[in-house]
Regions:
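Structural recognition of the conserved hydrophobic beta-strand(s) that form the central parallel beta-sheet
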Residues: 155-161, 181
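Conserved P-loop NTPase "ATPase switch" module shared by AAA+ and STAND
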Residues: 118-141
Length: 236
C-alpha cells in the first residue's frame, strides 16, 4: 500500500522503542501473577461483541501491567508481532501535539508496521490488536476511537485513570465499547500473591438467576467457609 505522511521522527523512534516485538526483541518482564480481571479482558479483546474494551481504574492498580500482560499473552499464543501495537500516551508526551494522535499512529502502523490496512488484515483472518494506555492524557480520545472502530476492523483495548474524562468519553461510544472497572487488590488476590493460591469467586461459576434459589446462598456460605482460613491469613 502507498505510504502516507509519516510521524515526527522522535515519535516514530519512541514507537519502535516501546514495541520491541516488531523487531523480534523481548519487551519488559512482567509479573507471572495476573489480576482477576485478566481473563475477562483477554476474552473481550478477542471475542467481545464490542470492538473496543475500556479498562477504567485509579492509578497504581495495575492497568498498564495488565496491558503489557495482554500483549505478552497475544504473542505467546502465536499472534504475529507486527499485528500488535502498544501505545502508552503517558510515555510519548509529544503525541499530544498531533491533531489526531490515535488516528495518526493507526495510519502509520498500517503503513510502516502492519504493511496493509487494518481492514485487509482482518479480512485475511489476521486482525490487529491496538493497546492504547492512559488515554486520559488526550482530551479528544473518544471521537478518535469512535472513528477508528467505525471505519477500521481491529480489536482495541483502552485504559484510563481519570474517571470523569473516561466516563465522558465512554458516553459517546455507546455500543462500541465494553467497560471494565478495576480497583485495588481483592483479598483473594492478596492471598494469591502471598501464598500462591487465589480462590475463584463463587459468582464466577454461577448465573445471576441462581440468586433467587435459597440453595444458592447455602452453597455460597459453604464455598466461602472452605477458603476462610486462606482469607484470614491474607488479611493478617
Amino acid at each position: 500500500m502507498a505510504n502516507r505522511r509519516s510521524l515526527p521522527l522522535d515519535v516514530e523512534a519512541d514507537l519502535w522503542r516501546l514495541n520491541p516485538q516488531w523487531e523480534g526483541k523481548p519487551g519488559p518482564a512482567v509479573p507471572a501473577f495476573r489480576r482477576w480481571v485478566f481473563r475477562r479482558l483477554r476474552r473481550l479483546l478477542s471475542d467481545g461483541l464490542a470492538p473496543a474494551t475500556v479498562l477504567r481504574g485509579p492509578r497504581r492498580v495495575g492497568k498498564t501491567m495488565l496491558a503489557r500482560q495482554l500483549l505478552n499473552a497475544l504473542l505467546e499464543e502465536g499472534t504475529a508481532p507486527r499485528r500488535t501495537l502498544y501505545l502508552p500516551f503517558d510515555e510519548i508526551p509529544s503525541l499530544r501535539q498531533l491533531a489526531d494522535p490515535i488516528l495518526s499512529v493507526a495510519r502509520w502502523f498500517e503503513d510502516y508496521v502492519l504493511g496493509r490496512s487494518l481492514n485487509e488484515a482482518a479480512q485475511a483472518g489476521e486482525v490487529a490488536y491496538l493497546l492504547l494506555d492512559e488515554v486520559q492524557n488526550l482530551a479528544d480520545w473518544a471521537p478518535q476511537l469512535k472513528h477508528l472502530v467505525d471505519n477500521h476492523d481491529a480489536r482495541v483495548l483502552v485504559t484510563g485513570s481519570s474517571s470523569l474524562r473516561i466516563e465522558a468519553g465512554r458516553d459517546s461510544l455507546a455500543g462500541r465499547v465494553t467497560t471494565v472497572d478495576v480497583g485495588p487488590l481483592l483479598l483473594r488476590e492478596i492471598a494469591g500473591l502471598r501464598f500462591g493460591h487465589m480462590a475463584e469467586p463463587f459468582w464466577g461459576a454461577s448465573s445471576h438467576d441462581d440468586a433467587s434459589d435459597p440453595d444458592f446462598w447455602w452453597q455460597a456460605v459453604a464455598y466461602s467457609q472452605a477458603d476462610a482460613d486462606l482469607r484470614l491469613r491474607a488479611f493478617g
